[in-house]
Amino acid sequence: MSSSTSEKNYLPEFFLACLGYFLFVSQDAIVKYIAEDYKITQIIFVNSWFALIPVILYTQTLDGWNKLKGANLKVHFFRSLTMALAVFFAYTGFYLMPMVTMYSIVFLTPLIITIGSVLFLNEVVRWKRFTAIIFGLVGALISIDPFGSKIDAYVFVALLCPLCAAASYLIVRKYGYQESIFSFIIYGKILMIIFSGIFVIFSFKTMNFNDLVLNGISGIFRGTAMILVINAARHLPGAIFGSIIYVQIFAGVLLGYLVFGEIPTINNYVGNVIIIAAGLYIVMREMKLKKNIVTSTARHPTIPIKKD
C-alpha cells in the first residue's frame, strides 16, 4: 500500500515537469516563427523581460528575496554568460534547422556534461557510461546526417549550444552549488537582459503588436517552464526526472509538423532513438551508482538541484 501511495505522490510533479518541457518547446516554436523578422538577440532581450514576470511572482510568493543576499556574483556572471550564449545558439539553430534536428543537438548536452565532469570535476566515469556517450554521439550524427545532401553549415553553429550549456552547468557544479535557486533565476534573467541588451542597442527593430505579444508569451512560457521543471527536479527521483526531459523531442516533432510542416526523416527517428537510449542508460547508471551528474540537470536553468 505504501509503495502505491508513494508512486501516486509523484504524479503531480511528473505532469508538471512534462508541462514545463512542453512550454519550453512551445517557446522554441514561437522563436522560430518570429526569427524571420528580428535579430535573435532582440528576441532574447524581450523574451527575458517577460520571463521575469513569473520568476518575480514565484520569488515573491515563496519569500525568496532574502536568499539573494550573499550571492556569488562572479559565479552568476559566468554561468549566465555561458547560458546566454547557449540560448543564442539554440534559437539560431531552431530558426535555421528543423526542430527535431536541433533537439538532436540540444540533447548532446547531458553527454557533454558527463565528459566535462571527468575533465573538470574529477568525477569517475567508467567504460559503460563512456560507451553510452559514444552511442549518443553516433545517434546525433545519424540524426543530423552530415553526409546527406541537405547538411547546412549552420549545424556547426548550433553545436555550440550544448557546449555552452554544459559549461554553464559545470561552472555551477564546481563553484556555485551553495547558491539558492532564487539567486539563479533572478540574477540569471537580469544578466540575460543585460547581455542581450548590449547588442539590441545597435540593432533594435520596432516590433509590431502581434510579434511583441508572441515574444512576450514565449518569455512567460520560458519563465513558467523554468519554475515547473526546477520544482519537479527537487521532488522527483532522479531516474524519473532524467527521463522526462526527452518529451521535448516528441513535442518538437509534433509542433514542427503542425506549425512548420517539418516531416522528420528516417535518420531523425533512428538517431533520436539512439540518443534517448544512451541518455536514459546514463541516468540509470547514475542512479545505481548514486551519482548526480546528469540526473540533476534541468534544461535552460542548468542548475544542480538540491532535494528538499
Predicted regions and their residues:
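Membrane-interface interhelical linkers
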Residues: 1-22, 52-78, 127, 177-182, ...
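Glycine-/small-residue-enriched transmembrane alpha-helix faces in small-molecule transporters
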Residues: 1-42, 149-174, 294-308
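Juxtamembrane helix-entry segments on the extracytoplasmic side of multipass membrane proteins
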Residues: 9-13, 68-72, 140, 145-167, ...
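Hydrophobic/small/kink-forming positions within alpha-helical transmembrane segments
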Residues: 21-26, 56, 80, 84-88, ...
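Helix-loop interface residues and adjacent transmembrane-helix termini in multi-pass membrane transporters
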Residues: 37, 93-96, 122-124, 178, ...
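C-terminal transmembrane-helix exit sites in multi-pass transporters
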Residues: 92, 109-131, 250-269
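Helix-helix packing/entry segments at the starts of transmembrane helices
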Residues: 102-108, 175-191, 226-257
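Hydrophobic transmembrane alpha-helices of multi-pass small-molecule transport proteins
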Residues: 128-145, 267-286
